[in-house]
Amino acid sequence: MNEHDDTRSGPLCGLRVLEFAGIGPGPHCAMLLADMGAEVLRIEREGGNGWPNPVVDRGRKTLTLDIRSVAGRERSLALAMDADVLIEGFRPGVMERLGLGPDELLERNPRLIYGRMTGWGQSGPLAKAAGHDINYIALTGALAAIRGESGPAIPPLNLVGDFGGGSLYLAVGILAALWERER
């Protein structure tokens, strides 16, 4: 992230985003920011199979790192020093255990916008549970409501909770935080 990508254009051109997001809404949020010109670097775990959707994966570079190793953590810290935005979608406490939580990174880079997204929030009875669209619609009863007259429920093809709720609200929150930072 030390060299600007001069081929990018759009209102977020020059904005540097570091993505530790995994699957679903995090990569979708990063895609939205990249579509508006941000320079996005996705940190992919070693041995990971990557996000399988080339549409959602567009507009970014990928770096493979073992962020659990000392070298991977140090490289991540260096990248965060040069970033404007960080996106992460791990369960609560994961980034803190790795030494990459918001307190640690904001101490080193006070201008960093730390975009954190979890399915159930950072605290509460479901905080440590995995959060995925299918869980939300099952828990709320929406999945049962969309089944036919007989047979099992059929999950919808679109992931409204992950993409319509998670990624869009994270993108709006990041843009609002950037606006506030620059005022």
Tell me what each language-model feature is.
Residues 1-10:
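Basic/polar N-terminal segments that are highly enriched at the extreme N-terminus
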Residues 9-47:
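Conserved small-residue-rich beta-alpha loop and adjacent elements
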Residues 18, 56-107:
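A structured beta-alpha segment of the ubiquitous adenosine-cofactor-binding alpha/beta core
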Residues 22, 67, 91-92, 118-119, ...:
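Short glycine-/small-residue-rich Rossmann-like dinucleotide-binding loops
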Residues 26, 94-96, 122:
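Short glycine-rich, flexible loops that bind phosphorylated cofactors or substrates
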Residues 32, 36, 98-183:
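Active-site-adjacent "lid/gating" segments in soluble enzymes
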Residues 35-66:
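Glycine-rich phosphate-binding loop and adjoining beta1-alpha1-beta2 segment
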